[in-house]
Amino acid sequence: MNNYVISLTSAQERRKHIEAEFGKQNIPFQFFDAITPDLIKEKAKAFNIDISNTNLTKGEIACALSHIALWHLAKQQNLDYICIFEDDIYLGNNAFELLKTNYIPENTHIVKLETLPFDRINRFNKTEKYILNRRLFKLNSRHVGTAGYILTNKGAEFLINILKTLNIPIDDLIFDEYLKIKEYKVLQMSPALCVQDFILNSKTNFKSSLQDDRAIRCNNEDKIKNQAKLKKPNYFLTKIQKELYRPFKQLKQKVFTTYITFK
């Protein structure tokens, strides 16, 4: 098992949580010291990533580079698989067996282990594999979050070769933008094997400055987009049409899509 948990060296409370969480199922792992904002220029240059024109916050860039660093580690060590986690996750049942990776179909780039309650997926996606009462199916639509995933050797090679600029968050890249590429294969595990603390618990145990920064950036970008929309001709007509279509869209989502649970 090549299990790595990205964590700031200063995040002792989170590290204790991970030690306890992985310890419950006797799962071996290593902490990977997260890249900090003061190092992003140095690390981006080392990985040949252009961050000169990005709107991302320094925290978002540091997060992305921490993941990219592990992709490079996997490639350098020629690992068949690497399991990458963030330090605020909880693991589901049978995690020890499911992290062995010997069940993963060929030509897979990533197996996404995590779920978020924001993005719906097609309930009729073809199942590629059943394992311990869970199924793996090809992810064809947006389902973001990088708190838990298995990256294959092929996947590491693919992502390192294609990612040259950071203009959007890392999870939007690998679990949305790149899904448009035909040969890129991401499998989603359902029910999911891990979930972040802020999803599982109504009272968040681990405050995240990264989530706060991202929320502020997104709100600012939304304001700019909304102002631009108001200036467009036929804006109000388009808005009325969208509102009329909304009930049909909601019905379609209810029939054809679903959320991924955590178990």
From Swiss-Prot:
<comment type="similarity">
    <text>Belongs to the glycosyltransferase 25 family.</text>
</comment>
<protein>
    <recommendedName>
        <fullName>Lipooligosaccharide biosynthesis protein LpsA</fullName>
        <ecNumber>2.-.-.-</ecNumber>
    </recommendedName>
</protein>
<dbReference type="GO" id="GO:0009103">
    <property type="term" value="P:lipopolysaccharide biosynthetic process"/>
</dbReference>
<keyword id="KW-0448">Lipopolysaccharide biosynthesis</keyword>
<keyword id="KW-0963">Cytoplasm</keyword>
<dbReference type="InterPro" id="IPR002654">
    <property type="entry name" value="Glyco_trans_25"/>
</dbReference>
<dbReference type="GO" id="GO:0016757">
    <property type="term" value="F:glycosyltransferase activity"/>
</dbReference>
<dbReference type="Pfam" id="PF01755">
    <property type="entry name" value="Glyco_transf_25"/>
</dbReference>
<keyword id="KW-0328">Glycosyltransferase</keyword>
<dbReference type="GO" id="GO:0005737">
    <property type="term" value="C:cytoplasm"/>
</dbReference>
<keyword id="KW-0808">Transferase</keyword>
<comment type="function">
    <text>Involved in the biosynthesis of a moiety on the core of the lipopolysaccharide molecule.</text>
</comment>
